[in-house]
Regions:
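Membrane-interface transmembrane helices that cradle and orient dolichyl/undecaprenyl
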Residues: 114-116, 155-173, 181, 306-309
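Transmembrane-helix motifs of polytopic, lipid-linked glycan transferases
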Residues: 92-116, 154, 158, 296-303
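Loop-to-helix entry region of an early transmembrane alpha helix in multi-pass inner-membrane enzymes
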Residues: 70-74, 82-103, 138, 142, ...
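Hydrophobic/aromatic-rich transmembrane helices and adjacent perimembrane loops
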Residues: 138-139, 145-148, 181-186, 190-193, ...
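Signature aromatic-anchored transmembrane alpha helix within multi-pass, membrane-resident enzymes
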Residues: 8-13, 176, 192, 212-220, ...
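Membrane-embedded, lumen/periplasm-facing catalytic core of multi-pass transferases
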Residues: 374-436, 469-478, 482, 526
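Membrane-lumen/periplasm interface segments of specific transmembrane helices
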Residues: 21, 25, 205-300, 383-395
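Multi-pass, polyprenyl lipid-linked donor-dependent membrane glycosyltransferases
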Residues: 92-100, 124-154, 159, 168, ...
Length: 529
């Protein structure tokens, strides 16, 4: 047994090496702003460190940052305090980002053990999780998903221990950890409902109060502060930057959440599948349905274990969290499901064990047809394992290196544009760009994103999207912006591709090319006459 545990531990340690290697390669954060949110977190951290309040320094008017809670920015602000020079301080930020991956792995091992896995199995499952390219990518990004997943895991472990020992002190600690998770990412709010339900069903209502008190305090404090400081605006761009709820309610039609759920559900299942077996290439014959089948497989395992054991706090939270991302106005891609990935991984391994036990039983049967079926299922399982392993190899040898090589080239082009801006533009000139955080950090110019169309994606209102971009000079004038920075990723945006012809658009009379680089173009926009 010790030999198996040692082998599993070695596998887990080796599974962390690709993430460490990528963190070293990407330590200068050429990909800063890849998710947009990461740039906003980094700028909010700068604001905290400089003592200017919790603000969006890059946005014209510098409104308060009332969209993202301050958990991660507070942590990153320590980097700005110790090393305030940008971009020289970015490698220090990578230390914080990279530390989240082993922390997530350790907490996930403890979680799976607490749910019934052996330590050996838990380490193997978590090693597979941290090898996933989506997890590795977030392990080298200034995003809160791994941090909130770690805090949630600690919260769940403490809550389970509080019930086992009937301890109010541990229940309080669990609530504090839940509050920290909420202050890192507000999507942790389902804990506020899941916790009391679970404690009550376990006949520990007294502990529920100790759990809820610090969690509720975190929700009340952040909600009160953000409500009082939200910029009073009906402008869609400002609302996007400053309010999740405001952005959701803006132009929301009656019962439109039903459309969100209908279109988000297949993405939800695919994202679960991709976090377990990455989709570097479509499976022959099955194609896009393979990740969904993997997602359903994991959910089946969760349900099976629930029926055999009982409904835990992790199930109540995952149910509430899943409902939240399904009704949201953005497709629930892999990023959104990282906080509940350990549960899906647990469900997948439970179902694999169940299937393997069934195959072994059938193989020992005297009936030839049962042995034939067992052989078929064994072959399918072996093929899936081989396919999954090959996808990891492709991800680490081809996909991830390609992504970061591309962003190295993009930043090189952008920095030449930034040098031109610093030499030729007045300091306060706002710039329209999807690289708003990066543009502000390298030039000091206020910057803002181009129009955002979450609801049009669900409505398939491509005409409105095309018209809005055709009228971009009007949009720019309304924001007092005269300049536009376009990058390579803008042209390849999967939502806009086929709708917006950037080459045709920027060849119009309102656009004057000022700087052209291999992967970036900088324009002056004249308002229409």
């Amino acid at each position: 047994m010790r030999v198996r545990q040692l082998a599993a531990l070695v596998f887990l340690i080796f599974a962390l090496i690709p993430g460490v290697a990528l963190a070293w390669r990407a330590r200068h954060f050429e990909h800063l702003g890849y998710f947009h949110d990461d740039g906003m977190y980094w700028i909010a951290a700068k604001s905290l460190a400089e003592g200017t309040g919790y603000r969006i320094l890059s946005l014209p008017g510098m409104p308060y940052q009332t969209k993202y809670p301050p958990g991660l920015p507070f942590l990153l602000s320590l980097v700005w305090k110790v090393s305030p020079q940008f971009p020289a301080n970015l490698p220090w930020a990578m230390l914080i980002a990279a530390a989240m991956l082993p922390a997530f792995a350790w907490v996930s091992v403890r979680l799976l053990e607490s749910w019934g896995c052996s330590r050996c199995a838990a380490m193997v499952v978590c090693a597979w999780m941290v090898l996933n390219p989506y997890i590795v990518l977030f392990g080298v990004s200034l995003m809160p998903e791994l941090l909130v997943a770690t805090l949630l895991g600690c919260c769940l472990l403490a809550a389970q221990k509080a019930v086992q020992q009937d301890s109010t002190r541990i229940a309080l600690a669990s609530g504090i950890l839940g509050g920290l998770a909420y202050l890192t990412k507000t999507a942790a709010m389902p804990l506020l409902i899941a916790g009391p339900i679970w404690f009550a069903l376990r006949r520990r209502s007294r502990l529920a109060w100790w759990f809820v008190a610090p969690l509720l305090a975190s929700v009340v404090v952040w909600t009160t502060w953000s409500t009082r400081h939200t910029a009073p605006s009906t402008d869609a761009v400002t609302i996007y930057y400053t309010s999740y709820v405001g952005d959701y309610l803006l132009d929301l039609r009656r019962f439109e959440w039903v459309t969100f759920v209908w279109k988000n559900l297949p993405v939800f299942l695919s994202s679960i599948g991709n976090l377990l077996i990455p989709d570097m290439k479509e499976v022959p014959l099955i194609g896009q349905y393979f990740p969904r089948l993997v997602g359903l497989f994991a959910i089946t395992g969760i349900v099976r274990r629930m029926r055999q054991d009982s409904i835990g706090l992790q199930h109540w939270f995952a149910g509430g969290y899943s409902l939240l991302v399904l009704v949201w106005q953005y497709p629930p891609n892999e990023r959104f499901l990282i906080p509940i990935l350990p549960l899906f991984a647990y469900g997948a391994q439970a179902e694999v064990r169940h299937l393997a036990a069934g195959v072994a039983t059938a193989w020992r049967s005297d009936k030839r047809d049962q042995r034939a079926v067992a052989g078929m299922f064994a072959a399918i399982m072996a093929a899936v394992c081989l396919w999954a392993s090959s996808m990891l190899v492709v991800a680490h040898l081809v996909l991830l290196p390609g992504i970061f090589s591309r962003y190295h080239a993009i930043l090189a082009s952008n920095r030449r544009v930034y040098e031109w801006i610093n030499l030729n533009l007045a300091h306060a000139e706002p710039i329209l760009t999807y690289y708003d955080a990066q543009t502000f950090l390298y030039t000091g110019h206020p910057a803002m994103r181009l129009p955002n169309f979450p609801k049009q994606y669900y409505r398939q209102d491509w005409h409105l999207v095309a018209r809005t971009y055709a009228e971009l000079p009007v949009f720019a004038r309304s924001r007092r912006a005269r300049y536009l920075l376009l990058g390579e990723t803008d042209r390849d945006d999967p939502f806009l591709k086929g709708i917006v012809d950037w080459k045709k658009l920027t060849s119009g009379a309102s656009y004057h090319l000022l700087v052209q680089q291999p992967m970036a173009e900088f324009y002056e926009i004249e308002p229409p006459r």
